[in-house]
C-alpha cells in the first residue's frame, strides 16, 4: 500500500507573476509527488471555481492562501493514510469533502494540486513514468501540437480580436520533427515581422503579438512564414484558430473591434467559413459564445465535417455539458483543461466520453502556466492525439514540449506520431 503520510500546500507564482497553488504529497516509502496548477485569462463561466483570497492589498486580490490552507488542514486530514494508487477513490473523497457543484468551497486549484501530486507520487512509487502510469502499455501515441505563434484577444495587447493563431505540423514522421518544424516557422515569422518593423514581443503564451490590420493579414503572414521556413502550407503545416468568441460577444453580436464588424451568429459563421475556404484551417476553437448554442449548431452544420470545432468555454471539460453537446450535435471536439474541472478522474472521464462519441480531445495548457508538465504525460497516457501548449518560446510552454521529447525517446520504436490522422472525424 502506498499510504499518504504528508501533504504540503504552498503559494507559488505562475508565468504571469500571479499566485497559484503547488502541492507536495509524501508517501510512506519516502516517495514524493509535486504538482502546480495553471490559471486562465479567458475563462468559461461554468468552469470550476479557482479560489482566490480577494485581499486587495496582497497580489491585487489574487493570493491563494485560502486554497493552500485548505490543503494543509482539512484536505490533509481527509486523505492522510489513503492509498495513493487509488486515484478514483481519492478524487471522490475530495469531491465529497468539497460538497459543491463547482468546487467553490475548497477551490478547484486546491483540489487539482492534490489530485495531480498524488498521481505523481503513486507513479514514482510504482517505478513508472507518469504517462505509463496513466495509460498502461497502450500509451504510445505522441500528440500533434497546435502551436500558438500569434497571440491576440485577452492574451495580448494588440488589435487582433481572435485570441490564437496556431500552426499544426502534420506531415512529419515523429514528434521531434514536428517540433523542429514549428520552431523553424516561429523563427521565420519573427524575421518577417522584424523586417517589416513590427513588434516581435510575445504574449502570455509565447506567440508574437504585433498589430495586424485584420485576421486575414495575420493568416497570410503566417503562410509566408511557413513557406520561408521551407514547408508547404496545407500539406506539411495546417492552421488553427482559437476565436475565444465569448470574449467579444456583446448585446447579441460578435463585435470584431479590430475590423470594425458587428456580426450575428449567422454572419459570424459566414465569416469563419470564408476564412476556412481561403486558408488551410483544420481547427477552430470557441467559434461561438459559450451560451450561443443556436450559433454553435449553425457553425457545426456548416463546417463540422471539414473543420475540427473545439468546445472550450462551451464544454469546460465537464461531462454533463459535453453529453448535452453530443446529444444536440454541437461541435465535434472538446478542449481538455485540467483546472476547468479540478480532478484527474473527472478529466479522464471527459476524454473517454469524447472518444466514445467520435469527438476529438485536445489537451490544453492555460495562459497562466508553470513549469509543471503533467499535461504532456496526460496527452500520451490517454492517447489524446492532440495538445495545445503555446508557442516556441517561454520555458513555461517549452517544458511541455521537452517532456514530450523525453517521452518519445523513452517509447523508442513503438512511438507513433499521428499527423493528419489525429483529426479522425473529418472528411
UniProtKB/Swiss-Prot annotation:
GO terms for biological process: glycolytic process. Its cofactor is Mg(2+). InterPro entries: Enolase, Enolase-like_C_sf, Enolase-like_N, Enolase_C, Enolase_CS, Enolase_N. Its EC number is 4.2.1.11. SMART domains: Enolase_C, Enolase_N. Pfam families: Enolase_C (PF00113), Enolase_N (PF03952). GO terms for cellular component: cell surface; extracellular region; phosphopyruvate hydratase complex. The active site is at residues 205, 337. Binds a second Mg(2+) ion via substrate during catalysis. (2R)-2-phosphoglycerate binds at residues 163, 337, 366-367, 388. Belongs to the enolase family. This is Enolase. The gene is eno.
Amino acid at each position: 500500500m502506498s499510504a499518504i503520510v504528508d501533504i504540503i500546500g504552498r503559494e507559488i507564482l505562475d508565468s504571469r507573476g500571479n499566485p497559484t497553488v503547488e502541492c507536495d504529497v509524501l508517501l510512506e516509502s519516502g516517495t514524493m509527488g509535486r504538482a502546480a496548477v495553471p490559471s486562465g485569462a479567458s475563462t468559461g463561466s461554468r468552469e470550476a471555481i479557482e479560489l482566490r483570497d480577494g485581499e486587495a492589498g496582497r497580489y491585487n486580490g489574487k493570493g491563494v492562501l485560502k486554497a493552500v490552507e485548505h490543503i494543509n488542514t482539512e484536505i490533509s486530514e481527509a486523505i492522510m493514510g489513503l492509498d495513493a494508487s487509488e486515484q478514483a477513490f481519492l478524487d471522490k473523497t475530495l469531491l465529497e469533502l468539497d460538497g459543491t457543484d463547482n468546487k467553490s468551497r475548497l477551490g478547484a486549484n486546491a483540489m487539482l494540486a492534490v489530485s495531480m501530486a498524488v498521481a505523481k507520487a503513486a507513479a514514482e512509487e510504482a517505478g513508472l513514468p507518469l504517462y505509463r502510469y496513466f495509460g498502461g502499455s497502450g500509451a504510445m501515441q505522441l500528440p500533434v501540437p497546435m502551436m500558438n505563434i500569434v497571440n491576440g484577444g485577452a492574451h495580448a495587447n494588440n488589435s487582433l480580436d481572435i485570441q490564437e493563431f496556431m500552426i499544426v505540423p502534420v506531415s512529419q514522421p515523429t514528434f521531434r520533427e514536428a517540433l523542429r518544424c514549428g520552431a523553424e516557422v516561429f523563427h521565420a515569422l519573427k524575421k518577417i515581422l522584424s523586417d517589416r518593423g513590427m513588434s516581435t514581443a510575445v504574449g502570455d503564451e509565447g506567440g508574437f503579438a504585433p498589430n495586424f490590420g485584420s485576421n486575414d493579414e495575420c493568416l497570410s503572414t503566417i503562410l509566408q512564414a511557413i513557406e520561408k521556413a521551407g514547408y508547404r502550407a496545407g500539406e506539411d503545416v495546417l492552421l488553427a484558430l482559437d476565436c475565444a468568441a465569448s470574449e467579444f460577444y456583446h448585446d447579441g453580436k460578435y463585435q470584431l473591434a479590430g475590423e470594425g464588424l458587428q456580426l450575428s451568429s449567422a454572419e459570424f459563421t459566414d465569416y469563419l467559413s470564408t476564412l476556412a475556404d481561403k486558408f488551410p484551417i483544420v481547427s477552430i476553437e470557441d467559434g461561438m459564445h459559450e451560451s450561443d448554442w443556436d450559433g454553435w449548431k449553425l457553425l457545426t452544420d456548416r463546417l463540422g465535417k471539414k473543420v475540427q470545432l473545439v468546445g472550450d468555454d462551451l464544454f469546460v471539460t465537464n461531462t454533463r455539458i459535453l453529453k448535452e453537446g453530443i446529444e444536440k450535435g454541437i461541435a465535434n471536439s472538446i478542449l481538455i483543461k485540467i483546472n476547468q474541472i479540478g480532478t484527474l478522474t473527472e478529466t479522464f472521464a471527459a476524454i473517454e466520453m469524447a472518444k466514445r462519441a467520435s469527438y476529438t480531445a485536445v489537451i490544453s495548457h492555460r495562459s497562466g502556466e508553470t513549469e509543471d508538465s503533467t499535461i504532456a504525460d496526460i496527452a500520451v497516457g490517454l492517447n489524446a492525439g492532440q495538445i495545445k501548449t503555446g508557442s516556441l518560446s517561454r520555458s513555461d510552454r517549452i517544458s511541455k514540449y521537452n517532456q514530450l521529447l523525453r517521452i518519445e525517446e523513452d517509447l523508442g520504436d513503438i512511438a507513433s506520431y499521428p499527423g493528419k490522422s489525429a483529426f479522425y472525424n473529418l472528411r
